[in-house]
Regions:
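Active-site metal-binding core of divalent-cation-utilizing nuclease and nuclease-like domains
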Residues: 1-30
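Phosphate-binding glycine-rich loops and adjacent basic patches that engage nucleotide phosphates
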Residues: 12-22, 46-51, 115-125
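Hydrophobic beta-strand positions in blades of beta-propellers and related beta-sheet-rich domains
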Residues: 19, 34, 179-182
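Intrinsically disordered, low-complexity boundary segments flanking structured domains
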Residues: 22-24, 62, 198-202
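Hydrophobic transmembrane alpha-helix bundles
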Residues: 23-38, 73-77, 101-119
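Catalytic cores of nucleic-acid endonucleases
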Residues: 30-35, 39-98
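Non-catalytic C-terminal interaction segments of nucleic acid-processing enzymes
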Residues: 91-243
Length: 243
């Protein structure tokens, strides 16, 4: 209860996270992350966007560090979050599972526990509610859990399905493109366009520059890499194969 896992981003910053699913990890050895999932509760909309930014600030640098494994990014949110804060996370690649405040209140009310509160709620009322929850029998809390799960079943199923797709994904296609030719630099867009108009394309022209590698998966994910030698290409492909 209350435990966190700590991961370091490529800039040397450490982040305490809620859930990380990894392959080949142990209590002593860090594995390869396949999912980062953060959880948060907010009662008021004025705090929701800040929390969304806090989540992305912790997770996106880690996603960058482990881009070869292309981990699942998840956020499980409860309470009151604005549509803008939710879309902000989704636009950055997060899968969001959101439990509306009203469904939480209704779930506890199903077991005769009133958890509704706002800024005007007296501390005495709040403490009484907390004590009621702490003393509630296991059967009552199971009832709350069941009610909340049923009320949000469609969203839960969608989130779990997306996570399962990531964990079960298979390589669908691998593209390796050897690039040749000299570099051409231009001061303006018009100069670049004139170059393209007069450029003749044929395979193997010029010196070898690098390999571009693109891998697509059955769940729609995609990873790519750019390498100057075959050894690095091989390492990249073997790493992905182990995922």
């Amino acid at each position: 209860k209350g435990k966190k896992v700590t991961w370091a981003d490529p800039y040397g910053n450490v982040h305490d996270l809620d859930y990380v699913l990894e392959r080949n990890g142990t209590n002593d050895v860090t594995g390869t992350p396949v999912a980062f999932i953060e959880m948060a509760w907010r009662r008021y909309t004025k705090h929701s966007r800040n929390k969304a930014q806090e989540i992305q600030g912790a997770i996106l640098p880690l996603a960058e560090k482990y881009q070869w494994s292309n981990p699942f990014l998840g956020a499980i949110l409860a309470g009151v979050f604005t549509d803008g804060s939710l879309e902000q996370l989704r636009s950055l690649g997060f899968h969001v599972l959101y439990f509306h405040y009203e469904t939480i209140v209704a779930a506890f009310a199903s077991e005769s526990i009133d958890v509704a509160f706002d800024e005007s709620t007296p501390d005495t009322v709040f403490r009484k509610c907390v004590q009621q929850i702490e003393k509630a029998p296991v059967s009552a809390m199971q009832g709350v859990k069941d009610h909340l799960g049923n009320a949000n079943k469609a969203n839960i199923d969608k989130f779990v399905a997306s996570l399962k797709e990531r964990l079960d994904r298979m390589v669908e296609k691998v593209i390796v493109i050897p690039l040749y030719g000299r570099s051409n630099e231009f001061a303006t867009i018009d100069d670049a366009l004139r170059f393209l108009d007069g450029h003749s394309v044929y395979e193997g022209c010029g010196d070898f520059r690098k390999y571009e590698v693109f891998i697509s998966f059955t769940n729609g994910d995609r990873v790519e890499g750019s390498f100057k030698d075959k050894t690095k290409v091989r390492e990249f492909l073997q790493f992905v194969a182990k995922q």
